[in-house]
Amino acid sequence: MAVHLYGHPCDMDQVMEIAKEHNLKVIEDCAQAHGAEYKGKKIGAIADAGVFSFYPGKNLGAYGDAGAIITNNDQVAQKTRMIANHGRIEKYNHEFEGRNSRLDGIQAAILSVKLKHLESWINSRV
């Protein structure tokens, strides 16, 4: 897991090289670096998956626990959705025991409004 901290990305070339040598998957922890870039690419979109926290104290915080996972891998995306929705594949069909980790409408609305201000908040910190 690569952890980007204080708005600064870690050395993703080195992380990805080590992962490739050892056939490992890489998850980027982007919780404290929303909007940061590494060599012109947004963090979270470099490795196999990126995770973001929307805990109230974070740069983009909701008013309760919340988070997001991003990936370009369709299998990872499907499995993540299933885990977040009680292991459900389709209505009344659950492949495994998952959990309820869906973002509720109130938190989504709060984040939607705050997201419009994120870039200016980031710029004011620099």
Where are these regions (language model features)?
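Active-site region of PLP-dependent enzymes
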Residues: 33-39, 46-126
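Catalytic PLP-binding core of fold-type I/II PLP enzymes
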Residues: 1, 5-40
